[in-house]
Amino acid sequence: MADFRIEKDSMGEVKVPKEAYYSAQTQRAFENFPISGIRFNSAFISALGYVKFVAAKVNEELGLLKKPVSEAIQRASKEIIENKFDGDFVLDIFQTGSGTSSNMNANEVIAKRANELKSGTDIVIHPNDHVNFGQSSNDVIPTAIRIAAVISVEKDLIPSLRHLQKTLLEKGKEYKDVVKTGRTHLMDAMPITIEQEFSGYARQIELGVERIESSLFRMLELPQGGTAVGTGINTHSEFGKRFAATISKETGYSFIEAKNHFEAQATVDAPVELSGQLKTVAVSLMKIGNDFRWMNSGPNSGIGEVELMALQPGSSIMPGKVNPVIEESLTMVCAQVIGNDATITIGGQSGNFELNVMLPVVAFNLLQSIEILSNASRNFADRSVQGLIVRKERIESMVGKNPILVTALNPLIGYDKAAKIAKTAFSENRSVLDVAREMTDLSESELENALNPINMTKGGFSE
């Protein structure tokens, strides 16, 4: 028995795998683009399902699709939304720049499944004439990008980042009374508490969420209804507005029709903006992850201020070695997101006249950035921050010998004399307090008050 069937399109006959739900145009694209094996993720496929579901519903309401046809398309599209047919979305992301191949992939899968599900009609549901009615790849794909990104950010990324922010604040509060050596240029500086340092990390994440939320407002404008070039040719004049209202009801997010369809289809400025904010979050996480690696370094020959969770052996040759694997995973994710942003930026420049022609690569990289940032942020919170232990005794011993503590004496004895004390303390491996007793006329109480590390974390002048 043959393992393929014959399908026809406007260009002729094509052999298609027998069990596949896609048809001729998808098969042609599959053969044309054997590039990377990278396919769209489930979020994008689900978004295509939403577009087709809502389009069928709205076109029925407008009297443009018969009810049995619309209902069958809606039922099939629901299964796409639920990712039941992800295996039939077989196309490489490096394909036609409009994403037409992936739009037709959705149209063909939904048409075949709708014909299986239909009742009350003898009409053969067609990928173009029914599933794609009143639509073009040029508004479907940009719309799907926005829907997928908004849902993924709201459902996954923002909750993960807020969880990380909360975890950082809680860990800082757990060690709020621990004073450590601050560092600038990787060199000893004035003291800071663990809580203060971790509050800075948490604020980075909080601001990242705010930046992302701000950029989402532009992502809520949907190109759907513009069809081929933004004029709305071959669709109802109310389609775009009704589509936005219906998709909002279906998803729970406040989508609106694009204020200008020519901008919405000719550019991907909104996705480029969102990617830029994702890059900023990646930069923040890279800094935090690297700080954790430095604080954990050693444990004997490095800074060794904290002890991260021992999750797996770190070396195939050195027994007992444990590495900061979660931080390394996190920082690699950050590097990928930063690289994705560069790709998206180049993609955004490829909007020639009325259409961007790098939509698939923009879609893939944007959604990958959202996905891996979501997963890495939560993993970092749960498998690193929560289990972090501060090595109090080591921190206290290092703070006591920090020559930069002498900075607190500047208002009392002047910069030059304070510098001499710092140099002596460092060269003789003594505490600043011990040297200051010999080199100043300050009383013991004055010195102890001025050189108390906890007092230095509260700002102001020494008294």
Question: Which positions does each model-derived feature cover?
Answer:
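Conserved, well-structured ligand/cofactor-binding cores
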Residues: 1-463
